[in-house]
Every structure is written in C-alpha cells, then in structure tokens.
Amino acid sequence: MFPRQILVFAALGLCFALVAGATQVSGVRRWELRRRFSFEDSFYHPPSGWESASPGEVLASRKVDVSPASIFNLGINAYQLLYRTTGLTDGEATTSVTTVLVPYNYDKDKVMVSALYEDSFSSECAPSKQLKSGHFISQNVAVAYQSLFLTTLLHEGWVVTVPDHEGPQNAFGAGPLEGHAILDAVRATINYDRIGLGSNAKVTGYGYSGGAMALGWAASLHKSYASELNVVGWAMGGTVTRMADWLRYIDGTGGAGFAVAALGGISSVDNDLQWVQDNLTPLGKIVLEKSKHSCMYKNLLEEAYKRFISDTYFQGGSTFFENSGAMYALNKYNLGEDGSKVPSAPVFMFHARNDIVVPYAMAQATARSWCQQGAQIRFTTYAGVEMGHTSAGIASLPDVLHFLRDRFNGKQWGETCQYPVVLDPWFNLFNLGESYAEFVQQLLDLLGRRIGKDDHILMAKLKKQEVP
C-alpha cells in the first residue's frame, strides 16, 4: 500500500475511532443523542414574502461552528445562509441553505463551491446539518469524510461555500434544481456583506459522484441562469449524465439504494413522475419512508440487490422503462444533449474506466458532446484495473486541486478538448509528495488548528507589496 493510501485510511480510522469512543456519554446511547439533535430548526423556514426575493438573495444568516468529521471544531469562521433559489423551472421559487467556510487571511477575490454528495432522500443528510457542530458522523459518513478535503481547499486561502444542493425537498437527482441551488449559493456567498467578497470574484466548483451530477447542471446552466458570475472552472468526476440509463443500470445491484433515493427525490418535485409515489404498494411505501430517514450508506445497506423499479414496489414499475411518459420525464435530466446548456468555463472531468457504480461510457459521451458544442473539456480516464468509483474519488483529489489552482491563477488552458489517459494517479510522484503533506495537515486541522494561509506567507506577500 502506498504511503498516501495509508494516510487516507489512517485519517479516516482516527475519525471513526474517536467517534466510536464518544458514542456513549454519561450512559446516554448514540441513538438518544442523535434524537436530541433532530429537532426542527426554525432557521430553515424563510420569512414571509420570501418568494419575491431575487435568486441568490440572503433571507437569513447565522454564525456557526463546524466540525467536518464530527470530532473537533475547525479553526475557521463559518456562516450559514438561507437564500432564495429556483426549483426545476425558471420562476419556481424555493429556498436552500449554504454553509460558508472562511479561513484566516482569505482571498476576497476567490470563492470555491463544493457540491458534496449526499445521494439520499433524507433531510437529515444535508451538508448544512452534517457540518454544523452537534451532529454525529454515523448519520452521514459520506459528508463527513468528503469534508476532510475541505481543509485542503481552505489552506489555499479560498472561501468555500457548501450548498444543500438537493433543496428543502431533498430532491436527489433533480439536476436543474440542484444546479440552480449551486449557482444561487455562490450568489448568496458573494452578496453576504459580512464576508466582503468582490462582486467579480473568481469562482470554481468541484463535485464527485452525486455532487458531480449537481455540479454538471450548474456548469450547464451558468451561462443562461447566472452569467454575471465570474466562473473560471469546474471539476467533476464519476458523473451521472443520463438518469434513465443509470437507474436501469443500478437498480437490482449493490447500489439499488441509489435508485430508491433518486426516484424518490425526483418524483417529489417533478409532476411528471408524481404518479410513482401515488402508486406505491404497501411495501413500496415502507421502503420510501425508510429512505426519507436514511443517509446514503444506511440506504445502500438496506436496499442492496433489491429491484425497486418493479411492480413489487409501485404499480407500473415493471414497465417503467417502456413508459413513454416516464422516459420523457427522465430525459429532462440528461447532460450534454441541449445545445443551449453547454458549460462556458473550462471543465475538468475524470472517470475510472472500471467504475461499476456510474458507467464510464455515459460520462465520456457527455464530455465529447460538450466538446463538439464548443466547450473546453479535459476528460481524464483513470484506466488502472484497481481504479473504481470510490478509489477514483479519493485518488483524483490532487489532480482536482491542481486544476482549481490553475484556474484561479489564470493558467492558459491549452487545446479546447483533451482526453488524457492515465493508469493510476497513485503513481504520480508529484501528487504523492504533495498529498502526504496535505493529509498530515488535515489531521492537524481536525485537532483544532487555525486554518488559513500561513501568516508567514501573508507577511512575505505584504513585504513584496503583493496582494495577499
């Protein structure tokens, strides 16, 4: 095992060990503690008249403590913003919340939006709830371990905004809604006076798996929905780009819980698929209700290898993929087919060729389609036999960081369409050395060290009369 892999699992092991040791406090069991923190939070309820607010307008704000792995508070300032956004279609008002992480000595001309994957149909799994101190790692392990990478981004001096991109109805898979929520989270972050970002601040975004699906929609809608944002790059990997194909592929496999969450999420906001919930069998009602209270891993464990899209769970399920109305509805969530929805900023896409959760071919086809329509795309194939969906999500992080740095620094892009193939990013010695330091840094961050650009770097820049 390579040193960086050891550090990754050591970091995660530390998180789990510390949390496991804290699951009983004064004789109170973990489920009892969790129940105490599941009360209704009035912050999520917008004030009267909110519907008339502009997309991205801040409706409420609060300062919060964040603990990404549910262990210690991060040494940063953090705020949560309730903001107005748009649902599936233009003019459909809704709200969401973004958690804004502000490191010390931060750059006021850079903001990075991180689309963490929830991949669930439960309100308790939203990043704003999981990042806020007081929630437990057992509720949403996915958000907890993804947030370890956030400290690396914060050490760059970037403001990082983390939206609840599924919205208040937890609409996992409802791409346009999620894209709107991401773009409006950036608007809200820039609009929030307490941070003081410039109106023309450079914007980048990153998402993997379900987060990439949401980010792909943000990239596609940027030009038509939020063209005033100075977006300089998007990074996404393991991306679902054709919803019907993915549901057909994943249902009945070990990832069947994704199908439950996605169909539940989309049908909760899309009138064209409301009939799915209206026609649930008694067993289907039980499964969907459980999904409403389960984060990703719990949902996957409980629904593994079940065929949810069948008459066993809802009437019409067995002929769902032959139903023209259902296919019309799901095809609205395909990326790369609409020439009016093409990313205008450079896009770094990456995918493991042997990904068994999200088929490689669909992501590659979308990348090529975007390229043919004038987008600037780098689609990197991780071709090593050991690279799958989970390993690619971790191994790609140094490549993602380099891309984001280059975009913020204005590095020349090169050829419009690029299709590099690498066996395995683990073998990139440049990445290996940098990552070793970064993961050690992250362990220190979890122990409460102050996070931001190091003061000696700040002083050196000031001495040279450079902008910090």
UniProtKB/Swiss-Prot annotation:
S-adenosyl-L-methionine recorded as keyword: no
Keyword hit for Secreted: yes
Domain of life: Eukaryota
Protein name: Secreted triacylglycerol lipase LIP7
Gene3D superfamilies in UniProt: 1.10.260.130, alpha/beta hydrolase (3.40.50.1820)
Primary location group: secreted
Native source organism of the sequence: Malassezia globosa (strain ATCC MYA-4612 / CBS 7966) (Dandruff-associated fungus)
Localisation: Secreted; Secreted, Cell wall
SUPFAM superfamilies linked: alpha/beta-Hydrolases
Entry's family note: Belongs to the AB hydrolase superfamily. Lipase family. Class Lip subfamily.
InterPro entries membership: AB_hydrolase_fold, Lipase_secreted
Residue positions of the active site: 209, 355, 389
Gene giving rise to this polypeptide: LIP7
One BP annotation, GO: lipid catabolic process
Role: Secreted lipase involved in Dandruff and seborrheic dermatitis (D/SD) probably via lipase-mediated breakdown of sebaceous lipids and release of irritating free fatty acids. Has triacylglycerol lipase activity and is able to hydrolyze triolein. Mostly converts monoolein to di- and triolein, while free fatty acids are only produced in low amounts.
UniProt signal peptide: 1-21
Any one GO cellular component localisation term in the record: extracellular region
Cysteine pairings via disulfide bonds: 125-295
Keywords carried by this UniProt record: Cell wall, Disulfide bond, Hydrolase, Lipid degradation, Lipid metabolism, Secreted, Signal, Virulence
Catalytic activity: a triacylglycerol + H2O = a diacylglycerol + a fatty acid + H(+); a monoacylglycerol + H2O = glycerol + a fatty acid + H(+); a diacylglycerol + H2O = a monoacylglycerol + a fatty acid + H(+)
GO MF annotations in UniProt: triacylglycerol lipase activity
EC number: 3.1.1.-, 3.1.1.3
